Each structure stands twice: as C-alpha cells, then as structure tokens.
C-alpha cells in the first residue's frame, strides 16, 4: 500500500496522520504527529476465536520511549521497564471512549499499541495517541462504530483554549480531555480550579465541536485505504428461550430487586439464576447454561431500567435525586497524622493522611523530565470490599485511575508549599463498595487532610451520577449504586467545593446524550455535592489548628545566600554536625531556604537556635556569654558565636604585669564579655564585665587584636603575638 497522508490544522499546530510506510504487517498502523511529537499506533485483531470468549478482550498499551526526548533510562538495566502510572492512565484514556463502539457480542481479541517515538515537551502526546488509535482502528478492518476524535480544552481569561501548550496549561484554570464521535460525547476527564457548571458544560461542547474536523479527516483516510470491514452480525437472540426465562424468573427477580441489602440481594439473585438454569436444562438438555445466564442478566437489566424510567423507587428505595445516608468519623486511627472513616450507604473508605518533608516527595522520572510530586494519593480496592477473594499486590489500572481522579479533585484546594511546607501522602482503603468509591475517596481525603491540620482552601466533596435512557425517556440518578452503574448508560463523576467544580469524569455507553441531559446531570450533581458538603461540615468544618502529636514538625527559615556556605561548612561538616547533634533533618536550597524536619519539637527549636547562632553577626555594644577558646601571652580568645571569636586583652584580665593569664582564666571557662569595638578588618575588642580583679595596668606594646575565626583556624602568627590575618571559611 502506498503511503497516505492527511494534514489538518488543530489548535496551534498541524495534525498529520500517515499510514502505509511503518508497521505494514499490522492490521492498522498510523503515525500521528504534531509539531515534533510523533506517536505510532498499531491495531491487530484476531479474525476468529471470539466464540470461546464471554467478554471483549480489548487491550490498550501506551508506552513512552526515552529516546523520544534524547534520554537514556535510569536504573541498572538502562531500558524501559514496567508501565509508569502516567502510561497506565493514558492507556485508560485511549480505552474508555473506543470500548463502547465495538458491536455487542463482539468477543474477538483486539490489541492497540501506542508508542511515543518523538516528543516535543510543549505538545502532549496523549491527545495524539487517542486520535492515532481512532485512525488505526478505522483502517484495520475491525468492526468498529467510529471514528472518534479527541481534544484538550483549557480556559483562561474567559476564553477556551484548544490543545494548549504545556506553558499555556500552567496558566489555565482548566485541563479537560474530551473524546467522542461526530454525533456524541463519549468520554470526559478534567481538572479545574473551582469552575462553574456552565463553564464546564461550555468546555465540553466547545471541545466536541473542535474535534469534528479530526473525525472528518480520519473518515477520509479510511476511505482512501479502502480496507473492507467484515459484516458483523451479533448472534441471533433465541426469542423462545428469552420468553421462557421471562416466564420462569421475572416475578422472582422483581422481588429480589426489592431487597435493599446488596449481599442479600446478590445471594438471592445467584440462587434464582441457578434455579432458572437447572429448570430450563431439565426441560431441554441441549440448551447452553452460559446462554441462559446471559439472558437472565438481560432480564435483570430490563427490570431495573424500566422500574426507574417508570418513576418507581430505585433498588435501595431512593428517588432519583437523594444521596445515600452518610456517616463520618474523623480521628478514626489513633497513631496516624490524620484519618477519616467515610461511609455512604454500602460504600466505605478509611482514608489516612501522612505528613512528610521534602525528602519524602516522589521523584517522577519520565520522558518529559524529572519532577517531584509533593501530593500523593493511593487508592486501594481489596477484594473483601465486595465480598470476594482475589489477588492482593500491585495496584491495577482501575485503582491507579480512581486514585488519579481523586487526586485531581483536591489539587485546586491544597495550600501553597510556602504556607504549608509538608509533603502529603493520602491512602484510601476501600473497605466496602457498592458504587462511587472514588467519590467516597474524595470526601474522605478532604476530611483526613483537615483532620491532619492541613489548611485546605475549601472542603471538597464528590458524587457519581448515572443515566438510564430508552428512546426519549430518561432518568438522571444521583449517587449511583454499583448495579445502577453496571446496568445504566452513563457514569458521570463530579467533585468540587461550594464555589465550583474541581474534577469531572464522564463515561457514556450510548450515543444521543443531549445538552438538556448534560445540563440536568450537572445541576443534580451540584445539588448532591452541596448536600454532602453540609454533612461533612457538620463533622469537621475547619482544619485542626494543631498537628497531631504524632506528626513531625517542619519549620522553614530564610537566610541570605552568602550565609549558605557558613551553614554547610567545609565538606558539609557544619550541617552534618547540626543534624547529628539535634537529630533534625535539615535541607537548604540555593536560594537560602532552610527546611527543618523533626518529630521532636524541642529538637527543632534547638536546631533553629544553632542555625541562628551560626549566621548571627557580633554587634558592638552587646554583652555575650562567651567561652574561653584559647589562652595566649597577650590575652585570651573568647568564643562569642559559633566560629566567631574576640580578643580579651591581658590588660582586661590581669591585675599587674607579673600576673599570668592562666592564673585568672582557664580554657573552657565561661565569662560575660562586652563588645567594645570592631575594627575595619573585622577584629573584635572585648571587655570583661564584672571581672573579679582590680583594673590592670597598661602593658606597653601589647598587641590588641581579635578575629571572627576560631583559634584552631589561626596561623602560627597568633602564638607569636603578630597581627592576625582574616581568612574566609
């Protein structure tokens, strides 16, 4: 096949789609490029074997190569390893809008691999990878009801930005990724700085409109490639069997869905499913048990959906707009820095906040460069939370994705590092789950942080919305259950403060979501969020004014840049000595900002005291409690501040010429001295306050000299009484 290229203007740059040159043995391969960022996306699908599956085995692998930015990977092996969290999140971003577009009962294996080959740091590869995946699917011959387009939308000064650069993103109040077909929005993922529902809805509509040119270009590319798609026909439904299942099980299934307790309801449905399979196999042993089970599931779906559309109570008895009962316990765990047990219906999370110092920040080394993450949020979904057994170990894609959503919801309200210098780690342990566990994590995180004393700008709550739609009839549901998510047409999560939205995630399984439906969903989400915030405020209205007694303390100091060397010392000796003597962790940056970190408040104060003494200047006219550091023939050197001595002349010590200094003072002795003066060379002249002996007679030709430096650093000239030269450390 000859090389085919399509090029369109998309935001600030041209988007180029090429096929026919690279990876020609794949069913579909597209090189998607934009201003130096190039992503190769391939699609391969098995033409048979689907009949043995009872699910759709679609896998999406997004991978970033370090050579794309001219870097060699770190680590011992010097090659790319397991996917990073960012790669996992972008894999999910590609997967979510395309999965609903494959035909029902299409169970053939499909694999999509997106590889970043070249990266311009100003052009994010995620949108390019999503568009490339859509194009590769469209030319692969796989049954796919696409193509889709994708776009990133920013918002600054009242204007929406299409595919903003990384620099523009830093100044934007919105980071929204949207994907969909030319007729419908399918997926939205966003982080915002407390924006209104109208602004968010406008961003979605703007992004959907802007991506239509991309979809048109992909359609043209597919036509030119000209690969025919096999006619895919879903297996014919056995209407006789369907009717028989309806006769045998409908009444019992309807009664089962009146059971409000999830585990009891599931147990009853499992019993009914087995009874139905046994009864029908007894009537006809040629029937397939899996087919009967699938049709039983369709019966469940029909019953639940029609009840809701008919205005009947939901599975747990609520109406469409009511949030489940909420209970909150802060300070749930005794020895943690901050904790919360958040329960909403049958969904529950233990959320724990831990405070650390700058050394605890996570170092992220990706192809975009190294960065430090000062706010980590880890979401864990153990199998016991849904009453099942399963593997426990590394987080799965879903856990990484849910944790990322909850993190984005809190980013807008975190205090500035200068205001609250702690590194924060949140862990959300989902202990029960029946829908919306990620939004329970958002609420629990907000409360746990406030319980830990973190001064959030505002509390954040989240709620998951659902949709049931059949023809022109629809119902928008607030705070959906797991079954309503599974059997419904939309999962729409919204998090925010009283002021506005901070995060939004939407996945739609059907086309035809109108602007009216979206507006109603946002309005109901605001109503639900406001209610939840009210309950949260009753439990903990403001952050704790004091940190937990088990939390470490951090103090930040600022010193002049020319004092940094003094604090560090030769070869780091001074700062190491401070750390060893006080037990305090000390970090100092090039601007002179010092961060002190210790679980011991007294140790922290001692370290501060010693640092202040290190950088303090000796002042004329001040009295100091000094220590005799060295005795010489013409007097004694008195240490006033760390590394800074002054000379107490023999005339201030001895009563007459015959008396020796050693007869009056000993090394290590503490005395109170007065700074009489400092000459141009920085030498300090001292007087002994309240000295015990009478005034000494003047000693002719005795040198009067002093220095800021300790005697250990003086040259042999000191002992001979010669002029002391000033040296720098």
Swiss-Prot record:
The lineage of its organism: Bacteria, Pseudomonadati, Pseudomonadota, Gammaproteobacteria, Legionellales. PROSITE patterns: KH_TYPE_1, S1. CDD domains: KH-I_PNPase, RNase_PH_PNPase_1, RNase_PH_PNPase_2, S1_PNPase. Its cofactor is Mg(2+). Mg(2+) binds at residues 485, 491. Component of the RNA degradosome, which is a multiprotein complex involved in RNA processing and mRNA degradation. This is Polyribonucleotide nucleotidyltransferase. Its EC number is 2.7.7.8. Its main location: cytoplasm. It comes from Legionella pneumophila (strain Corby). Keywords: Cytoplasm, Magnesium, Metal-binding, Nucleotidyltransferase, RNA-binding, Transferase.
């Amino acid at each position: 096949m000859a090389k085919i290229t399509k090029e369109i203007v998309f935001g600030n740059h041209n988007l180029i789609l090429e096929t026919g040159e690279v990876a020609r043995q794949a069913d579909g391969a597209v090189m998607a490029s934009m201003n130096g960022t190039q992503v190769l996306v391939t699609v391969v699908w098995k033409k048979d074997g689907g009949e043995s599956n009872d699910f759709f085995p679609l896998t999406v692998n997004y991978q970033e190569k370090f050579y794309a930015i001219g870097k060699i990977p770190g680590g011992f092996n010097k090659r790319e390893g397991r996917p990073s969290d960012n790669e996992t999140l972008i894999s999910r971003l590609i997967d979510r809008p395309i999965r609903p577009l494959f035909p029902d009962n299409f169970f053939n294996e499909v694999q999509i691999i997106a590889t970043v080959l070249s990266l311009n740091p100003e052009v994010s590869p995620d949108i390019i990878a999503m568009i490339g995946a859509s194009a590769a699917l469209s030319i692969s011959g796989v049954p796919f009801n696409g193509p889709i387009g994708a776009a990133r939308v920013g918002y600054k000064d009242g204007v929406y930005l299409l595919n903003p650069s990384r620099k523009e993103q830093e100044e934007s109040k919105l980071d929204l990724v949207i994907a969909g077909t030319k007729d419908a929005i399918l997926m939205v993922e966003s982080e915002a700085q407390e924006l209104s529902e109208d602004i968010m809805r406008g961003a979605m509509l703007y992004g959907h409109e802007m991506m239509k040119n991309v979809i048109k270009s992909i359609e043209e590319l597919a036509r030119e490639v000209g690969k025919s798609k096999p006619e895919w026909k879903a297996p014919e439904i056995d209407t006789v069997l369907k009717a028989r299942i309806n006769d045998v099980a409908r009444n019992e299934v309807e009664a089962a869905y009146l059971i409000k307790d999830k585990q009891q309801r599931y147990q009853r449905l499992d019993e009914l499913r087995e009874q139905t399979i046994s009864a029908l196999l007894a009537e006809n042993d040629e029937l397939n048990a899996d087919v009967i089970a699938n049709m039983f599931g369709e019966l469940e779906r029909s019953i639940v959906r029609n009840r809701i559309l008919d205005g009947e109570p939901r599975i747990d008895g609520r109406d469409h707009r009511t949030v489940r009962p909420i209970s909150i316990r802060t300070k749930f765990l005794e020895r943690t820095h901050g904790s919360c047990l958040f329960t909403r219906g049958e969904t529950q999370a233990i959320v724990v906040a831990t405070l650390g110092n700058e050394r605890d920040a996570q170092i992220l080394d990706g192809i975009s460069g190294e960065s430090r993450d000062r706010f980590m949020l880890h979401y864990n979904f153990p199998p016991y939370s849904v009453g099942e057994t399963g593997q426990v170990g590394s987080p799965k894609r879903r856990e990484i994705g849910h944790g990322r959503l909850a993190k984005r919801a809190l980013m807008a309200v975190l205090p500035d590092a200068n205001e609250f210098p702690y590194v924060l780690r949140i862990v959300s342990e989902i202990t029960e789950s029946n829908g919306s566990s990620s939004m329970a994590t958002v609420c629990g995180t907000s409360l746990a942080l406030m319980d830990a004393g973190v001064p959030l700008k505002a509390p954040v709550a989240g709620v998951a919305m659902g949709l049931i739609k059949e023809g022109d009839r629809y119902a928008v549901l607030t705070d959906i259950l797991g079954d309503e998510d599974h059997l419904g047409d939309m999962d729409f999560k919204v998090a925010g403060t009283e002021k506005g939205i901070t995060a939004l995630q939407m996945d739609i399984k059907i086309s035809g979501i109108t602007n009216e439906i979206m507006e109603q969903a946002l309005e109901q989400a605001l109503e639900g969020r406001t209610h939840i915030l009210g309950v949260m405020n009753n439990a903990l209205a403001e952050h704790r004014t004091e940190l937990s007694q088990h939390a470490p303390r951090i103090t930040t100091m600022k010193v002049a840049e020319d004092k940094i060397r003094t604090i560090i010392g030769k070869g780091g000796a001074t700062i190491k000595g401070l750390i060893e003597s006080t037990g305090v962790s000390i970090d100092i940056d090039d601007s002179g900002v010092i961060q002190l970190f210790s679980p011991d408040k007294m140790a922290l104060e001692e370290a501060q005291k010693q640092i202040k003494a290190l950088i303090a200047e000796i002042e004329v006219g001040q009295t100091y409690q000094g220590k005799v550091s060295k005795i010489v023939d013409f007097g004694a050197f008195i240490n006033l501040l760390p590394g800074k001595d002054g000379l107490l002349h023999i005339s201030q010590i001895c009563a007459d010429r015959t008396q020796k200094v050693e007869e009056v003072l000993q090394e290590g002795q503490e005395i109170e001295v007065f700074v009489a003066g400092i000459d141009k060379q920085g030498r300090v002249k001292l007087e002994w306050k309240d000295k015990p002996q009478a005034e000494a007679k003047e000693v002719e030709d005795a040198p009067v000299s002093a220095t800021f430096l300790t005697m250990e650093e003086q040259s042999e000239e000191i002992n001979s009484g010669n002029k002391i030269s000033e040296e720098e450390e």
